Swiss-Prot record:
<dbReference type="GO" id="GO:0050661">
    <property type="term" value="F:NADP binding"/>
</dbReference>
<keyword id="KW-0274">FAD</keyword>
<feature type="binding site">
    <location>
        <position position="35"/>
    </location>
    <ligand>
        <name>FAD</name>
    </ligand>
</feature>
<dbReference type="Pfam" id="PF07992">
    <property type="entry name" value="Pyr_redox_2"/>
</dbReference>
<dbReference type="GO" id="GO:0050660">
    <property type="term" value="F:flavin adenine dinucleotide binding"/>
</dbReference>
<dbReference type="InterPro" id="IPR022890">
    <property type="entry name" value="Fd--NADP_Rdtase_type_2"/>
</dbReference>
<dbReference type="GO" id="GO:0004324">
    <property type="term" value="F:ferredoxin-NADP+ reductase activity"/>
</dbReference>
<keyword id="KW-0560">Oxidoreductase</keyword>
<feature type="binding site">
    <location>
        <position position="330"/>
    </location>
    <ligand>
        <name>FAD</name>
    </ligand>
</feature>
<comment type="similarity">
    <text>Belongs to the ferredoxin--NADP reductase type 2 family.</text>
</comment>
<keyword id="KW-0521">NADP</keyword>
<feature type="binding site">
    <location>
        <position position="43"/>
    </location>
    <ligand>
        <name>FAD</name>
    </ligand>
</feature>
<feature type="binding site">
    <location>
        <position position="123"/>
    </location>
    <ligand>
        <name>FAD</name>
    </ligand>
</feature>
<dbReference type="InterPro" id="IPR050097">
    <property type="entry name" value="Ferredoxin-NADP_redctase_2"/>
</dbReference>
<feature type="binding site">
    <location>
        <position position="289"/>
    </location>
    <ligand>
        <name>FAD</name>
    </ligand>
</feature>
<protein>
    <recommendedName>
        <fullName>Ferredoxin--NADP reductase</fullName>
        <ecNumber>1.18.1.2</ecNumber>
    </recommendedName>
</protein>
<dbReference type="InterPro" id="IPR023753">
    <property type="entry name" value="FAD/NAD-binding_dom"/>
</dbReference>
Amino acid sequence: MAQHETDAVIVGAGPVGLFAVFQCGMVKVRCHVVDALEAVGGQLSALYPEKPIYDIPGHPSILAADLVERLSEQAAPFAPTYHFGTQVSTLSRLDDGRWLCGLSNGDSIAARAVIICAGGGAFGPNRPPLDGLEQFEGTGVFYLVRKREDFRGKKVVIAGGGDSAVDWAISLSEVAAKVMVVHRRPKFRAAPESEARLKQLAETGAVELVVPYQLHGLEGENGTLSAVVVATLEGETKSLPADVLLPFYGLSSDLGPIAQWNLGMDRNLIAVDPATGATDAPGIYAAGDICTYPGKLKLILSGFAEAARVAHSAHDVVHPGEALHFEHSTTSGVPKG
């Protein structure tokens, strides 16, 4: 069990957490970063690394994985210490005013400031209730697309009617041997332009729409999927030859220990002062999707601005009484970590 000391602990290594490392470094606040996943990037890396993002300033389009890589490179000069595959399970105040973060792996970190950038908390897919599902998970059933090329030449069944299902059906139609989309109703819940594109592909035969049907069963052996059985609400079934099933039924999230930290929760979000990012607890701040305040916009762009705000707030508790002389990065450059 290792004991660490630093200026600030950042909870979450997603895009906002990574940018918080950079912003803290710019104001001479050293950071340790804790994330339950095994690498940086949060949902961008774990769920849709190859999906394009369109609302990052200066990037008409950038892949999620590329954005994570650049944010990580931007934070690197400040030499943050990462703690992957663990979470902050306990948070307590020390006699000297610092916060002690107890990690689930037994380590601990003492810091003047804690910055929570945990998004929606720990997350996982909503799994379809199918007999024998477990034997195909990781071999024929996947809940995310890491690399589109993994599906080249394969028969792919996509289940769901939201943006993820529709967007991936469109994308995978370019590489898969066949794409079938199973949805329990003819109308989809995706962006209108995406739904229109999907129907165009269906008209040309590039995608097959299997509606109104829902998942009913799986066929195969030794972890190798051979078919997906679907059924109507009336019980009529049919078998779809398939190599892969991608159920896109959304995610369930859990704040875990964060919900027990008495930080002024508001519908599973942390209420903060919009001027400082401060929570109800002194020295604890929040940024990104996990925080809320009047007029909050849940955008990565907003999270970046909040990361800058909380970094400046953290400076005041890490270096009390030390005036922060603000300079634009074009003037100051990037200090060494």
